[in-house]
């Protein structure tokens, strides 16, 4: 007994010595869990593989099981020749092979990729409908073991839909459009990279969440991918992914016959064009015999398409679909088609109507291997949108939902935003087609309209950063996407808790803290960026990152708010607006047509109302804006305190990396809060009843300080500076000093400095109080892997804050900041804030 206690003590000490990790293994860390001798003896000690050929998913399953048991339990699983009744073994096989070799087994009907998992102590059977399903079952069992779940189970599970793909927007030069985790793992300098190790690891992660295909290149495709040398490169990518049951697909440029093939047309009905594409497809399948198919973006945002020749979208899609049919390939055709030169003066103009207008009348005209890939909302991955009505308008056409793991409009992985609760607002939405239950999840699976093909696509955009997405916590979104694509009725919080256990361990405080932070994160981000259905009030013209609400209007992009001095919101009603509500089935349209029945969180999406309109909550629209933005920023600051409570419970490398992002998010949430509130206060003249907006008693505006070598600078947009003005050095190669006498009472304060970190320079600042240097820092965010879209301008994208905690000051002390310009960055400063510890200004 005493020996066992000593063993447990040593094991606990070893487990407490948290080793440094960089995130490369994601949720497949296979971290050790406690398992005493009795526990070990109750688990399998052998692995048995049936029909395991070299490079097959079943061989991969055996390798993963061995590696997992060794790492998790320090158990060496030995291979054993196949026997039907192997004891103390994990048996992995396809169901058909097992039935041929052994007795029949009572297993429920499985769909392709499905599996049966039976665990009875030291005997485990994993039977897949196919080899890929068997691999999925192995990962399922390993996930149980990694979470110290040794319970007896016996169940079958099949995928919600056959298509469970990820999209990468990787360019041939190695950049990634809307990617925030480093350069491409697939391409560099116009060709496919040599090193396939990251590709294999990515495929491994995807297989573990049951993703079955990757589209490896940008939807804004470069035709040079179709050159013979790049086809050879695609073959190497496919070879790296194949052992994990992950197929590859590619995006196509519609004009390739002209751009690459030397034809004078890309008309989809031209016989020469048809022959050219068939030849290209034949060649691709020579290099990649199991290629999943194509993804096409056409007639959208400058991309060529069939409309050039007055052909329909279905005629364009069918060109590729027919070329793929002999090989069983799928054509994913994006529904993201709209006019980006709309006339805002036309009250009826509405980009949100475009998808239904373009596709509804073509229903039933697409080939059976065409799937229309529909964004979850009718605009573009906003913080909240209503469900795209196109899902309700295609009875005779296969559909898939398009989600975005990459946080293009949602903080670009620099802000914690756990996305499944957002996705579930669409997946669980009942469109009531023909007055019958019509959940979006049942439409994309094919169940509602009796379609055999359909499913899921997500824009992921992993890169060479060891965290894959740039942020450790952002990986929860990729994990959850795979889980939901398999089983969309799973609860967001349960998925999150499973991911946390696999990624950060079994500590209950860690699990509860990360769960609470993450489940709060989307509402918080919505609060401080754009609420009531107004969309994300970011800069839609360039970065899609920082606040810039003015860019929503006065252009042809159609993401309008129609905000003015008196009122705000898009009137999308039938009776007085764009008629968008009429694209929904009758029961849904009736809800959104009425201001009284429209939920508050979408009121500005569907209705144009006075700023003084009272919501169902009883609060006016403008006051809701003010309140929500303050609440959101307060929540973001809470994330830092919550994360800091995990110090010592998470390895130092991941703890510090994530803490720095959360600190940044807290500061940037203040930038967002003030920019949006100041913009609309300036527009409406309606004050905040709580007296917060425009009143910051703890701040010292930089332009009010004594300046030497600094000059004032009027920031544009004005709301991106606390008092519309910042200071910059008089040249880009000089030093400036700003000083002031502290008027605050003596005491201990947190000193925050809001400044601008521009791309293309690394200014240096030194903060002093009295005769003591408080701290120094560099404007080097472009080099410290923060990863968001950079900016060379003073604005909401480059604005940020650094805080020095627990600084003792005396009233009358001189506060001084010395800024040394570098490159294009003139050491810009906005304001200093002196806060009693724990207060959010």
Swiss-Prot record:
Superkingdom, natural source: Eukaryota
Keywords in alphabetical order: Carbohydrate metabolism, Glycoprotein, Glycosidase, Hydrolase, Polysaccharide degradation, Secreted, Signal, Xylan degradation
Name recorded for this polypeptide: Probable alpha-glucuronidase A
Reaction(s) this enzyme catalyzes, per UniProt: an alpha-D-glucuronoside + H2O = D-glucuronate + an alcohol
Entries under InterPro entries matching the protein: A-glucoronidase_C_sf (IPR037054), Glyco_hydro_67_aGlcAse (IPR011395), Glyco_hydro_67_aGlcAse_N (IPR005154), Glyco_hydro_67_C (IPR011099), Glyco_hydro_67_cat (IPR011100), Glycoside_hydrolase_SF (IPR017853), Hex-like_dom2 (IPR029018)
Signal sequence, start to end: 1-20
Family assignment from sequence similarity: Belongs to the glycosyl hydrolase 67 family.
Compartments in which it is found: Secreted
GO terms assigned for molecular function: alpha-glucuronidase activity
Annotated S-S bridges: none
CDD domains: CBM6-CBM35-CBM36_like
Enzyme Commission code(s) on record: 3.2.1.139
Pfam families, alphabetized: Glyco_hydro_67C, Glyco_hydro_67M, Glyco_hydro_67N
BP-aspect Gene Ontology terms: xylan catabolic process
GO cellular component, one term: extracellular region
Keyword field contains Metal-binding: no
Chief place of localization: secreted
Keyword Secreted annotated: yes
Residues listed as glycosylation sites in the UniProt record: 51, 76, 85, 149, 222, 279, 310, 343, 450, 465, 527, 576, 682, 723, 732
Top-level class of the enzyme under EC nomenclature: hydrolase
Cited function: Alpha-glucuronidase involved in the hydrolysis of xylan, a major structural heterogeneous polysaccharide found in plant biomass representing the second most abundant polysaccharide in the biosphere, after cellulose. Releases 4-O-methylglucuronic acid from xylan.
């Amino acid at each position: 007994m005493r020996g066992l206690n000593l063993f447990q003590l040593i094991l606990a000490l070893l487990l407490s010595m948290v080793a440094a990790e960089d995130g490369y293994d994601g949720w497949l860390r296979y971290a050790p869990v406690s398992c005493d001798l009795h526990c070990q003896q109750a688990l399998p000690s052998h692995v048995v593989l049936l029909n395991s050929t070299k490079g097959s998913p079943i061989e991969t399953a055996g390798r993963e099981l061995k590696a997992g048991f060794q790492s998790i339990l320090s158990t060496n699983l030995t291979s054993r020749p196949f026997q039907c009744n192997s004891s103390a073994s994990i048996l992995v096989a396809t169901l058909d092979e097992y039935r041929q070799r052994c007795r029949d087994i009572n297993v429920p009907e499985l769909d392709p990729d499905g599996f049966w998992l039976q665990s009875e102590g030291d005997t485990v059977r994993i039977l897949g409908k196919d080899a890929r399903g068997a691999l999925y079952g192995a990962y399922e069992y390993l996930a149980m073991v990694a979470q110290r779940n040794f319970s007896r189970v016996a169940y079958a599970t099949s995928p919600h839909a056959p298509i469970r793909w990820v999209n990468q927007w990787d360019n041939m030069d190695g950049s990634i459009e809307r990617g925030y985790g480093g350069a491409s793992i697939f391409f560099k300098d116009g060709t496919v990279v040599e090193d396939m190790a990251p590709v294999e690891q990515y495929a491994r992660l995807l297989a573990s969440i049951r993703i079955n295909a990757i589209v490896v290149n940008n939807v804004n495709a470069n035709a040079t991918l179709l050159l013979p040398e790049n086809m050879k490169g695609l073959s190497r990518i496919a070879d790296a992914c194949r052992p994990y049951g992950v197929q590859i697909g590619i995006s196509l440029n519609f004009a390739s016959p002209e751009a690459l093939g030397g034809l004078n047309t890309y008309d989809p009905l031209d016989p020469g064009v048809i022959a050219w594409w068939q030849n290209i497809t034949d060649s691709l399948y020579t290099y990649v015999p199991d290629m999943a198919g194509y993804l096409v973006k056409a007639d959208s945002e400058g991309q060529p398409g069939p409309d050039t020749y007055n052909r329909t979208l279905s005629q364009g899609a069918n060109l590729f679909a027919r070329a793929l049919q002999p090989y069983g390939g799928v054509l994913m055709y994006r529904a993201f088609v709209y006019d980006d030169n709309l006339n805002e003066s036309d009250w009826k103009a509405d980009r949100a109507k475009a998808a239904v207008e373009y596709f509804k009348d073509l229903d039933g005209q697409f080939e059976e291997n065409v799937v229309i890939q529909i964004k979850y909302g009718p605009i573009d991955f906003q913080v909240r949108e209503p469900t795209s009505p196109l899902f309700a308008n295609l009875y005779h056409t296969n559909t898939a939902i398009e989600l975005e793991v990459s946080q293009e409009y949602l903080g670009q992985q620099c802000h914690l935003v756990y996305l499944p609760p957002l996705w579930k607002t669409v997946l669980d939405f009942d469109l009531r087609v023909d007055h019958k239950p019509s959940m979006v999840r049942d439409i994309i699976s094919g169940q509602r309209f009796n379609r055999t093909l359909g499913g899921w696509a997500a824009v992921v955009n992993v890169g060479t950063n060891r965290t894959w997405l740039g942020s450790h916590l952002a990986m929860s979104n990729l994990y959850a996407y795979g889980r939901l694509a398999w089983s969309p009725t799973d609860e967001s919080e349960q998925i999150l808790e499973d991911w946390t256990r696999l990624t950060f361990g079994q500590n209950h405080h860690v699990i509860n803290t990360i769960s609470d932070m993450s489940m709060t994160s989307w509402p918080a981000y919505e609060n401080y960026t754009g609420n009531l259905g107004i969309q994300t009030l970011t800069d839609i013209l360039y970065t899609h990152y920082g606040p810039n609400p003015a860019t929503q209007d006065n252009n042809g992009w159609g993401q309008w708010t129609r905000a003015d001095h008196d009122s705000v919101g898009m009137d999308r009603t039938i009776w007085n607006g764009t008629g968008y509500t009429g694209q929904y089935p009758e029961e849904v349209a009736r809800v959104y047509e009425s201001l009284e029945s429209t939920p508050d969180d979408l009121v500005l999406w569907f209705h144009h109302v006075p700023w003084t309109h009272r919501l169902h909550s009883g609060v006016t629209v403008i006051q809701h804006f003010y309140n929500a933005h303050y609440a959101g920023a307060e929540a973001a600051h809470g994330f830092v305190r919550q994360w800091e409570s995990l110090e010592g419970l998470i390895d130092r490398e991941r703890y510090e990396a994530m803490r720095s992002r959360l600190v940044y998010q807290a500061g940037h949430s203040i930038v967002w809060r003030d920019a949006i509130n100041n913009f609309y206060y300036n527009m409406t003249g309606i004050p905040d009843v709580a007296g917060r907006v425009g009143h910051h008693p703890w701040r010292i505006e930089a332009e009010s300080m004594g300046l030497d070598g600094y000059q004032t600078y009027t920031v544009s947009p004005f709301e991106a500076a606390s008092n519309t003005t910042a200071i910059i050095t008089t040249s880009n190669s000089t030093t400036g000093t700003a000083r002031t006498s502290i008027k605050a009472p003596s005491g201990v304060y947190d000193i925050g400095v809001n400044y601008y970190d521009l791309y293309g320079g690394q200014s240096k600042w030194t903060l002093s109080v009295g005769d003591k240097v408080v701290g120094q820092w560099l404007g080097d965010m472009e080099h410290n892997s923060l990863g968001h879209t950079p900016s060379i301008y003073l604005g909401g994208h480059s604005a940020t804050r650094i805080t020095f905690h627990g600084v003792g000051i005396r009233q009358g002390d001189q506060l001084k900041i010395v800024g040394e310009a570098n490159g294009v960055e003139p050491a810009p400063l906005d304001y200093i804030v002196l806060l009693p510890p724990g207060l959010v200004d």
